[in-house]
A protein has these predicted regions:
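ATP-dependent adenylate-handling active sites, centered on carboxylate activation for C-N bond formation
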Residues: 1-166
Length: 166
């Protein structure tokens, strides 16, 4: 039986790195990670811009970890499942905690999904292809998005707030 392989990248002390380590240990995955410095991030900007084919600062900033992640994963696999869109789909960003109610969260989720698909797919595709890696984005599948968005606002909000308190 083949062991599930997981990857994460970031900077030391990142809560995402800590969470990835915990999940890997819990699930028993073959976990690989790469911790990059600010200097390393700055040094790859020309490559990121080249592969993204844009000078858009926010897209470049968000593509830097994807670049490191694709470079790491390409040493082990040819195809990856990414988490692109999961933070948006399940209201995982901190600013969602400040929403006045579940209806506001639902409205914001609907708003951001009009633009998310193109930006996230472009970034994931171009950074993985830069390293000969294919990325699949299951959280951006229209059927997954539709199913999650049909969950009652009140129910999804209760789940969100319960999970955030863990």
């Amino acid at each position: 039986k083949q062991q599930f392989i997981t990857f994460t990248v970031g900077q030391e002390g990142s809560p995402d790195i800590t969470a990835a380590r915990m999940m890997s240990e819990h699930l028993g995955t073959d976990h690989h990670e790469y911790l990059f410095t600010s200097e390393e991030a700055c040094s790859i900007i020309p490559d990121v811009v080249y592969h993204l084919e844009t000078y858009e600062p926010e897209l470049i900033r968000s593509a830097i970890p994807n670049y490191f992640l694709a470079r790491l994963a390409s040493k082990y696999v040819k195809v990856v499942l990414t988490g692109e869109g999961s933070d948006e789909l399940f209201a995982g960003y901190l600013y969602f905690r400040d929403a006045p109610n579940s209806i506001a969260i639902h409205k914001e989720l609907r708003r951001i999904f009009h633009h998310l698909h193109n930006v996230n797919c472009q970034r994931a595709d171009r950074m993985t292809m830069a390293h000969g890696l294919e990325a699949r984005v299951p959280f951006l599948d229209p059927n997954v998005i539709d199913a999650v968005m049909q969950v009652s606002c009140l129910r999804s909000s209760a789940v969100l707030y319960e999970c955030n308190s863990l």
